[in-house]
């Protein structure tokens, strides 16, 4: 399986990079994993609704250009469906079983994702009703993907 994480913005925090690199290394035994960072749009502190929509549209274009046409797309959204670790593992297992070998997870920028990206999504996934920094979500997401593969293989890790 090919797992791609498309995320808006550049990861700056060293401790997050180290954690992500560790899980990416662990995942190599199960899947090919790549992380694509698309540029975030420069935006002033205060914006009108139209300006926010334009920022999301531009970031959305960059996200969509990074997604293969045959990929199964999972967007991370506050209003998405909440799944437990076992349910996410089952979903990834089902995708592999039914020939969906390319799975793309999308983490939007600070304003969220555009409507075009939402329309391209096959599954809107929520980790919580709370808001998290999108850089931190990369680490949380890649850990959950790793956990999913361990669950699906019946290997110890999941508790």
Curated annotation (Swiss-Prot):
Pfam family, any one: SPOUT_MTase
Gene Ontology terms, MF aspect: rRNA (pseudouridine-N3-)-methyltransferase activity
Domain of life: Bacteria
Cystine pairings recorded for this chain: none
Record carries keyword rRNA processing: yes
Catalytic activity: pseudouridine(1915) in 23S rRNA + S-adenosyl-L-methionine = N(3)-methylpseudouridine(1915) in 23S rRNA + S-adenosyl-L-homocysteine + H(+)
InterPro entries, per database record: Alpha/beta_knot_MTases, RlmH-like, tRNA_m1G_MTases_N
Gene3D superfamilies assigned to the protein according to its UniProt record, in alphabetical order: 3.40.1280.10
UniProt keyword terms in alphabetical order: Cytoplasm, Methyltransferase, rRNA processing, S-adenosyl-L-methionine, Transferase
Annotated residues for binding of S-adenosyl-L-methionine: 76, 108, 127-132
Subcellular location(s) per record: Cytoplasm
GO CC annotation: cytoplasm
EC number(s) reported in the record: 2.1.1.177
Recorded family membership: Belongs to the RNA methyltransferase RlmH family.
Subunit structure: Homodimer.
Free-text function comment from the UniProt entry: Specifically methylates the pseudouridine at position 1915 (m3Psi1915) in 23S rRNA.
Protein name per its UniProtKB record: Ribosomal RNA large subunit methyltransferase H
Origin species: Oceanobacillus iheyensis (strain DSM 14371 / CIP 107618 / JCM 11309 / KCTC 3954 / HTE831)
Name of the encoding gene: rlmH
């Amino acid at each position: 399986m090919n797992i791609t994480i498309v995320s808006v913005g550049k990861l700056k925090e060293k401790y997050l990079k180290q954690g992500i690199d560790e899980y990416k290394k662990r995942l190599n035994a199960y899947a090919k994993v790549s992380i694509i960072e698309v540029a975030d749009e420069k935006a002033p502190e205060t914006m009108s609704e139209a300006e926010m929509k334009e920022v999301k549209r531009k970031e959305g274009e960059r996200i969509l250009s990074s997604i293969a046409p045959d990929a199964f797309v999972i967007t991370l959204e506050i209003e998405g469906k909440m799944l437990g670790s076992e349910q996410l593992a089952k979903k990834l297992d089902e995708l592999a079983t039914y020939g969906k070998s390319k799975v793309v997870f999308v983490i939007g920028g600070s304003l969220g994702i555009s409507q075009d990206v939402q329309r391209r999504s096959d599954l809107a996934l929520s980790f919580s009703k709370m808001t998290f920094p999108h850089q931190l979500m990369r680490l949380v997401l890649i850990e959950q993907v790793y956990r999913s593969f361990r669950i699906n293989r019946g290997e110890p890790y999941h508790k």
